């Protein structure tokens, strides 16, 4: 087999048993790897109704067949599990170097089962695997954990994925961090890791990923890298300004969510833009493994020193969504979240819900006491409550449940800007209605990455579409983006490659690496299979499409108050039935047997 090793580790933390399991190329041709392999294993082995924080839940850490190769952005890995935040499937994706190192060690996945009675970490050096005591690491922040493990093992070549105090304390939106500041961030994967008392996974590998046709692969890769470098976004805006290049673009288009999505225009957007960050604080770019784009930022602040980030989503979540414009405070807060192991989007979204509850009088000074008041623009709220959330102290214990549960405690869940209890990212769907349909139908909830309709609706990739068009063409484009994202994740590449590359380009790289002769349609069918399999998991876990596949009332009933999208709402009810029909599902959003048989997943019905 090429690309994949055809084997994965199964680590049972209840028994301490470590097993090597193998699989054949037939399985790889059906699921490709990574996100695909993971959902196959979860459906085959796990009850979707299992407690996300119980021993029955599985945590699967998995690179793809192109991870660790020279394919552009071939450093990605996925963390797939049942989310404690949503109760459904989640697939958190991260870059850096950890995923590539896991492939260099000779593994396609680590399947973590059970729960340890005491803190542990997993040490992997090629075929050597140990479960080690981590009692001395419990309580440490991410940078301290990485430094301590490298010192203990005696190697600076290690790449480490770990949780901070937020994961240890089962914060519903705790992240898994790797290589310092790279995050598998969303929907509480860090809490699942913490529930298993697994502090970290440290990996060192010395193998080379097997390639079917090395010369052809090298030529294909060179061609794709050139396409990316010649693209105005992948080769221009992202390398120059990072993902924060989007701040001004999204604000000018009137969908930069401000003050908990009350409007889509922020008067201080430029002050927190990529252009402003580059001028004030940037030291250098920080690319992930094999990445020709290099969107990562390394900044230096007088108060903090050198740190990585923040990305566009983090700038917005810890900035405009809270009415905060001070970029230095945002960078400091992002650093805090990375060290504690918190998802910045959900952290900011939860604090924004608290601010609106405070603004409307439902959260009062009597409850806050001496704590900073939840006023829009108050930077003290950031630094004070981020730590409180990570350690579940005082009001932080309630905030650690996420915005939906927090707002529900005060009788007003409508102030949670979330889908399936996962906080929405930095695009108001009233300014991109196809993107809004993507939020509603995303398998992991309020996510932008897996259905990035901002590309056609705002940025013009692969071509410009009217953001307020809700035709079948728009719905079909969303379905293509969802299936393609599943394929790219399963391959082990970054979704930013879609700026410059199309489905045929992924086909070329995969065929050269794996030695297959698949068509573009064959690969997109794998993506469709993965998307449907994840939905099947959710349906078995209790997904009620009529109740769960919607948007916050604000987007459906409250017209955008200002800017280019003034007067618009999301016409979800007009799009959703057509989405189900074009997916080949029933009118109530379920997968019929004939569709499951077409995709080869009927065994899981």
UniProtKB/Swiss-Prot annotation:
Residues that hold [4Fe-4S] cluster according to the record: 288, 291, 295, 494
Keyword Amino-acid biosynthesis listed: no
Binding-site residues for tungstopterin, renumbered to this chain: 76, 93, 95, 182-183, 185-186, 338, 342-343, 444, 450, 489, 493, 495
Note describing how the cofactor binds: Binds 1 [4Fe-4S] cluster per subunit.
Enzyme Commission identifier(s): 1.2.7.5
Catalytic activity: an aldehyde + 2 oxidized [2Fe-2S]-[ferredoxin] + H2O = a carboxylate + 2 reduced [2Fe-2S]-[ferredoxin] + 3 H(+)
Any GO MF annotation of the entry: 4 iron, 4 sulfur cluster binding
Domain of life: Archaea
SUPFAM superfamilies given in the database record: Aldehyde ferredoxin oxidoreductase, C-terminal domains, Aldehyde ferredoxin oxidoreductase, N-terminal domain
UniProt cofactor(s): [4Fe-4S] cluster; tungstopterin
InterPro entries xref list: Ald_Fedxn_OxRdtase_dom2, Ald_Fedxn_OxRdtase_dom3, Ald_Fedxn_OxRdtase_N, Ald_Fedxn_OxRdtase_N_sf, OxRdtase_Ald_Fedxn_C, Tungsten_al_ferr_oxy-like_C, W-dependent_AOR
Keywords, alphabetical: 4Fe-4S, Iron, Iron-sulfur, Metal-binding, Oxidoreductase, Tungsten
Similarity comment: Belongs to the AOR/FOR family.
Subunit annotation: Homodimer.
Name of the featured protein: Tungsten-containing aldehyde ferredoxin oxidoreductase
Species assigned in the record: Thermococcus kodakarensis (strain ATCC BAA-918 / JCM 12380 / KOD1) (Pyrococcus kodakaraensis (strain KOD1))
Lineage: Archaea, Methanobacteriati, Methanobacteriota, Thermococci, Thermococcales
Encoding gene, per UniProt annotation: aor
